[in-house]
Amino acid sequence: MKLKAKYKQQSKVGKVVQVVSAVVDVSFAGKDLPHILNALECTINNEKIVLEVVQHIGDDIVRCLAMNSTDGLFRGAEVIDTGEQIKVPVGKSILGRILNVVGQPIDDLGPIKCDNFSQIHKDAPKFINQSTSRKILITGIKVIDLLTPYISGGKIGLFGGAGVGKTVLIMEIINNVAKAYKGYTVFTGVGERTREGGDLYKEMVGSNIIDLNKLENSKVTLVFGQMNEPPGARARVALTGLTIAESFRDMNEGEVLLFIDNIFRFTQAGAEISTLLGRIPSAVGYQPTLATDIGSLQERITSTKFGAITSIQAIYVPADDLTDPAPVACFAHLDATTVLSRKIAELGIYPAVDPLNSSSQILDANVIGQEHYSVATKVQEILQTYKSLQDVIAILGVDELSDDEKRIVSRARKIQRFLTQPFHVAEVFTGKQGRFVSLEDTIYGFKGLIEGKYDDLPEMAFYMVGSIDEAIEKSKTL
């Protein structure tokens, strides 16, 4: 395959000497070697393959990571050094579009006309440029707004094992927050199902977040590196999405929402790459650079004087083990953690948020107000007492409890059920209309519960309702 003469004149040309899955060795014999992280390009059957330099291994050979499939690549194929890192288009011209890891459109809407490009590898903003303001981001989801309030301009993690509702919860937050949001939104799909990305795109078109008739009026950009793609794409696509979010932030046009689903797949891709590069694995088979990989991504997700990035990230927990090194590496970087529990999901309580394991840095009376703080801590206290009594109940039964303990158990069970909520994105499955509950209604409802105002209502009146008024109406039909 002959490359265009103009590329040969301005770029170094090498030759492929080895291809092992997504790792490609390229020889630049007698020439200066490309820098680490430089992008190399090779054209096979009119398809461009993008490589990223990750190692210099001696004998004028660089080891590279492929961003797309290496099918058809052969020894001796010519490769050009672009002389720069992978760059992706940024700015308003990519609104309403779906991009891959190298910024190419994958939505069949034609090429992107863009003059502004930005490299995907960057340093975090300097300390003096970072913003530390703290205010609550209202999601309309009772259990989150009450017990683990999200920080506007902060980093939020949704932790959970397989099938407990991470993606549904992140989709509901997109529905409640992004649709009513004036700023821009970036959704980054990292190693997840292609079908989910397609469903999200259609939903955004249907709700006019993406305006196909006038793309510049759209409010979102989608970036996908799905589970069928090489580990290079899955390891770098989170950086591509973050680069686009940073560009919107630095345009000084308000806050930016950055959704990432799923951070664990980013870690998993890093482990695959580490093995292919011959590194010795660390605990549980993860790459030895796990903390560095996570840190280099998370430290860039920050708010500055120009604008704020609010990041909401789904994080898969292998085998429901929160002590696994991958989720542990994420905990330290987050401002709020929402833990989804399989035991709670088994009780039919959705969203299956564990109110005692989840936390937020702004669950503080000085930030959220004394009333909100008092109600939240009292709810946690009642739920903790109920949890400690469950062994007694299992062995001796409820009748052996004191009257005060029986009252706490009754209120705790009602609180548990009132923490449930029908979701807009799950209407087709539940047959129930979704509910958005304001923070004021949430605090008012739980305050009444802990004060005993609704002790006479049956438990099921509180299940899958929005506000407390809806629970009162439901009790009349039971």
Curated annotation (Swiss-Prot):
UniProt keyword list: ATP synthesis, ATP-binding, Cell inner membrane, Cell membrane, CF(1), Hydrogen ion transport, Ion transport, Membrane, Nucleotide-binding, Translocase, Transport
**Residues that bind ATP:** 160-167
Q: Does the keyword Transport apply?
A: yes
Location(s) in or outside the cell: Cell inner membrane
The lineage's top-level taxon is Bacteria
Return the EC number. 7.1.2.2
GO molecular function annotation: ATP binding; ATP hydrolysis activity; proton-transporting ATP synthase activity, rotational mechanism
Question: Which PROSITE patterns does the record cross-reference, listed alphabetically?
Answer: ATPASE_ALPHA_BETA
> According to Swiss-Prot or TrEMBL, what is its membrane topology?
Peripheral membrane protein
- State the reactions this protein catalyses: ATP + H2O + 4 H(+)(in) = ADP + phosphate + 5 H(+)(out)
GO CC terms in record? plasma membrane; proton-transporting ATP synthase complex
Chief location of this protein? Answer: membrane
Q: What does the subunit section of this Swiss-Prot or TrEMBL entry state?
A: F-type ATPases have 2 components, CF(1) - the catalytic core - and CF(0) - the membrane proton channel. CF(1) has five subunits: alpha(3), beta(3), gamma(1), delta(1), epsilon(1). CF(0) has three main subunits: a(1), b(2) and c(9-12). The alpha and beta chains form an alternating ring which encloses part of the gamma chain. CF(1) is attached to CF(0) by a central stalk formed by the gamma and epsilon chains, while a peripheral stalk is formed by the delta and b chains.
Task: Family membership, please give it.
Answer: Belongs to the ATPase alpha/beta chains family.
In UniProt terms, what function does this protein have?
A: Produces ATP from ADP in the presence of a proton gradient across the membrane. The catalytic sites are hosted primarily by the beta subunits.
The record's section on PANTHER family has: ATP SYNTHASE, ATP SYNTHASE SUBUNIT BETA, MITOCHONDRIAL
Name under which the protein is recorded: ATP synthase subunit beta
List the source organism.
Orientia tsutsugamushi (strain Ikeda)
Annotated gene: atpD
